[in-house]
């Protein structure tokens, strides 16, 4: 439980222990990569990470497919397979025996079919994606969002995200994971989170009916609230914002003769395919200035949060993400064969795996594509760069509405 | 490889994102274009007021003289372009290669743009109805008849979200610089050549570079230009027009539905006007909003349609560098196929006949691996009811519609250019009063034969300036 010992907020420890699950079954959660001693021999680190992933995979499959701990959904699904997950999954690559996960399975109820028996009775959340029209996709969560963001916390530099300082969360709340997750991150680091909500479903509706002025007015309404909070003396030093909202906030502050830096913010994380190398550079050089740290993240409700490779001028603003292995894995696969990895530097579609006690996803085809990247010392497994909407969907996808 | 930067108030900017612009036939990358992002535009527009300040250091007359010089440079000089240079022949070649417009049409568009620049002073005199230019510069002044007038600039810059495939639209923004208003251009992804060449020509003619921004980029760039410029023009389809309808900040240019109307007094002589009709439909490959998409008459419509079909139906695509090439290619994948399918569907309606098919050796749609052609199509409609009677496509296409003269004005709907062949004073008066016709030609004028001293889709002076009251002394006692 090393993640807890790093917290500067003792009451959180208590909460986490109370919420800890299944005391009789130990799932080894290997330390997040940043906690690993830097091993000079990258290939050794890669092998070690691979071994951990294999072990974690087996353990996760055992949990989800064992009649005493598995979820009704997977136990039912297993009956349709021509293989036995309990005996025939011996490493991560064996997950390819599963048919691809269909995200349509996440639409509709009952949501309880996703709760593993081993976690029955725990307080559960539902987070949703999509949902502008029709039934949204739902994911049941108990504590994954906390764990994901605690792990992410360990990658944040304290000098830019000072522990004990307060946060601004500028993005969607409602049925999304973000608000609760960022709020937990703030609390985990000993701070309090101030939240400004944005309803992306409403923005999509406005844009679809061509009401650009309405969407702009709504964005202004959101930004005005953020400006007010920042001016209210709450000692806010850290922020999460979507790229569009951060941009609007920074420009609004400039219009008022001040800036993100002058408002006291020293560290920001933002995410999504709109966080492009050009936008990264624009942020550092013009929008925020050199004294405000910004780091990209990539993730979704299903996967958790992938971290950006630490900024290095030599990268020329290339953004490379690494999944929080072994809890989640990102593969970059061929467009015409989703079981085949592309070569390093080559372009492919993003395939996600989620391997936590709460959720098992053996290969979900994300709506993004990118280039496969080599492992990094800090993250000794494959990364992905240049994430952008999958070209076959790009023209029909509304991106970056918030 | 030609590398084309973003231009931020005259300064080249290298982006982290570059997009190749490719030859429509071969897919070969012809240039790498640096891509702006929306935030960067919003950031730059915070300094927009400077552009007008800089331009007001010159008189409008001086700027008009610079336009004359720029016209010559644009038409004849070898000018810098990104990390290379470009002469006029190279300009036409690359514009043709990315837009699918034959080289001879690119050259014709060049001459048209240059003409407008050369005659800028007359154009402005016409559009301002002889207003002394210093009134626009100072915001107010005394007219020669002793009346105080005031024209207040409504913006420091004009934003333009330009189309990808239509090099003919650039004349619209050329008067902006001499009107002492800066230019913020978001070029179309396939037709950035005119904006960049014109920028360089203006700069070399003495216009300070600091009054220009050129932002090649994605949709967010167009959005940022539209959001931050107090006055903007955008080009698009009916949906775009609808979106900006009633927004005083925006002039939206879309389909023209331009038409030729033959009055009952002249329709019996229709054969005399076949050249005028064919040229209105066909020139510039029918790609302009000012190209005629309809010929309306109360009688002889079948014969008119047949004559037009006989003239245009056999015309086939030729290589882009063939001086006789007259058909432009469709370079957007699937567009021609979809249009063709839509036409076939609309032809199924009773009373609609395609007349050109019998004069064409082969199909209307000629698909290639990376591009397509649609061959000229003439349709006859026995009434104005079928949807195809009032349709416009980006190729030489026209419906010849039978309609009684007394119903014509009502039935033609919105019409950008209406060429009306009549000498009937009563009908002429009705045509003059018809508010659904924007540019009215009464007489033998092709729909695409624009006089540059006339306003186009609204007077740009009225768009950029507002006439208002100004007094610096009390009025006479009354």
PLM segments and residue spans:
Chain A
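Intrinsic-disorder-associated, low-complexity terminal segments enriched in Asp/Asn/His/Tyr and depleted
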Residues: 20-22
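Short, highly selective alpha-helical patches that border small-molecule cofactor pockets
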Residues: 177-182, 280
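Nucleotide 5′-phosphate-binding alpha/beta core
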Residues: 17, 27-128, 134-166, 171-175, ...
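Active-site glycine/GP-rich loop and adjacent strand/helix microenvironment
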Residues: 40-63, 84, 189-402
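Extreme N-terminal basic, low-complexity initiation segments
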Residues: 2-8
